[in-house]
Swiss-Prot record:
It is an enzyme of class 3 (hydrolase). Its EC number is 3.1.3.11. Binds 2 magnesium ions per subunit. Keywords: Carbohydrate metabolism, Cytoplasm, Hydrolase, Magnesium, Metal-binding. Pfam families: FBPase (PF00316), FBPase_C (PF18913). InterPro entries: FBPase_C_dom, FBPase_class-1, FBPase_N, FBPtase. This is Fructose-1,6-bisphosphatase class 1.
């Protein structure tokens, strides 16, 4: 039996998935194929390295950050069902089509520091319902519970898409010969327990005490109250770390720290935390800042940052109980 294509899968889905939403998702997938092709060329096309400027986050942009962002902006701003879009790379939102039913938010190339060393990167996207015929900035200020779809594309040894439209999580793999996303896993589930964790341990001295306590217990392994050993993984690309969790369980932490107390966290609520939280929760996992469920946060600004603790439910609940 042949695998369903992404388009065929979307035609069969029900619930929140309207034909218009399916078209938006198809366009995102098609654009990610173009990004994938650019990444494959890399040094051959002279597009590795820095673009020589910073984005709104104060981060140095890679050339492929800019290229990927442009591809998505160009494809979505003319889409008849997209009222507006927002990118992690741009200060303000981009107005799209009048009466477009959906708003699209995205991180065009997550983990771009990995580009020049040929490690995994990804595209993350979130889709919200539009609020007005002509999109306004305030229309994007919706809690993650309002998302109608979320997903990512992982550019790795094989190019894969993880997608939820509010009815579980499915994986699609890009066939390099036909350039078609094919359904390869349905009903993805995150195991409730795990022995893997992902955190940037170089920030340990800046963590709050609850996170310090939790990680110290994991590192102590069998000699601690946990009575089992844990392995640490860190890809420096949220897409890569979350994909691993969806495949075999685990917990990912980018907690609040005291290095810059004015910043609530490192990761962006709208472009990273919300879509990844929807995916993880739809697969049976959990997602929190350590104090509140991420999907229930009412955003106050487009580039709002939050702490993120996400993954296997029992581990997320345990570290939350320490706060």
């Amino acid at each position: 039996m042949s695998n369903l294509t992404l388009s065929q899968f979307l035609q069969q889905e029900k619930g929140n998935l309207t034909p218009e939403l399916a078209q938006v998702i198809d366009t995102i997938a098609a654009t990610c194929k173009t990004i994938d092709q650019a990444l494959q060329k890399g040094a051959l096309a002279g597009i590795l390295g820095s673009a020589g400027n910073e984005n709104v986050q104060g981060e140095t942009q890679k050339k492929l950050d800019v290229i990927s962002n442009d591809y998505l902006i160009d494809a979505l701003k003319v889409h008849p069902h997209v009222g507006g879009l927002a990118s992690e790379e741009l200060d303000d939102f981009t107005l799209a089509q009048e009466n477009g039913e959906y708003l699209v938010l995205f991180d065009p190339l997550d983990g771009s520091s990995n580009i020049d060393i040929n490690m995994c990167v990804g595209t993350i996207f979130s889709i919200l319902p539009a609020k007005n015929a002509v999109t306004q900035a305030q229309d994007f200020m919706q809690a993650g519970t309002q998302q109608v779809a979320a997903g990512y594309v992982l550019y790795g040894p094989s190019t894969m898409m993880a997608l939820t439209v509010g009815n579980g999580v499915a994986f699609f793999t890009l066939d390099p010969e036909t350039q078609t996303f094919l359904l390869t896993t349905e009903n993805v589930q995150v195991s409730a327990d795990t022995q893997e964790f992902a955190i940037n341990a170089s920030n340990q001295r800046h963590w709050e005490q609850p996170v310090k306590q939790y990680i110290e217990e994991l590192l102590a392994g069998k000699t601690s109250v946990r009575e089992k050993d844990f392995n640490m993984r860190w890809v420096a690309c949220m897409v890569g770390d979350v994909h691993r969790i969806l495949c075999r369980g685990g917990i990912f932490l980018y907690p609040y720290d005291l290095k810059d107390p004015k910043k609530a966290g490192r990761l962006r609520l709208m472009y990273e935390a919300n879509p990844m939280s929807m995916l993880i929760e739809q697969a049976g996992g959990a997602s929190t800042t350590g104090r509140v469920r991420i999907l229930e946060i009412e955003p106050t600004e487009l580039h709002q940052r939050v702490p993120v603790i996400i993954g296997s439910k029992n581990e997320v609940e345990r570290v939350t109980s320490y706060h």
